[in-house]
From Swiss-Prot:
It comes from Schizosaccharomyces pombe (strain 972 / ATCC 24843) (Fission yeast). The lineage of its organism: Eukaryota, Fungi, Dikarya, Ascomycota, Taphrinomycotina. InterPro entries: PBI_I9, S8pro/Inhibitor_I9, S8pro/Inhibitor_I9_sf. One of its GO terms (biological process) is vacuole fusion, non-autophagic. The keyword Cytoplasm applies. It is found in: Cytoplasm; Nucleus. PANTHER family: PROTEASE B INHIBITOR 2. This is Uncharacterized protein C338.12. Residues 5-74 form the Inhibitor I9 domain. Keywords: Cytoplasm, Nucleus.
C-alpha cells in the first residue's frame, strides 16, 4: 500500500508522554515516524498508509496536519 508523508502539529497542551503514545499508536498502524519538532511547535513528521490518514483527523490531541512538501522562502530562479 502507498505511503504519504505528513507534518503533524499537536495541541500546545500535549505533554511528552502523550506525544510518545500518539507516535506509538501510529506506528502500530504501519506509520513511520520521522523528525520530532519541539521548538516552534509540538509535532512530528510521519509517513503512513493513505488509509490511515483518518486516524490523524480523528485524534483529539492533533491540532493540524498537512502533506509534507518542499517550501521556499524566496523566489527560485
Amino acid at each position: 500500500m502507498s505511503q504519504k508523508s505528513y507534518i503533524v502539529q499537536l495541541k500546545d497542551s500535549v505533554d511528552p508522554a502523550s506525544m510518545d503514545k500518539i507516535k506509538s499508536d501510529l506506528e502500530a498502524s504501519g506509520a513511520k515516524i520521522g523528525h520530532t519538532y519541539d521548538t516552534v511547535f509540538k509535532g512530528f513528521s510521519v509517513s503512513l498508509p493513505e488509509n490511515a490518514v483518518d486516524a490523524l483527523s480523528a485524534h483529539p490531541e492533533i491540532q493540524h496536519f498537512e502533506p509534507d512538501q518542499e517550501m521556499h522562502t524566496m523566489k527560485k530562479d
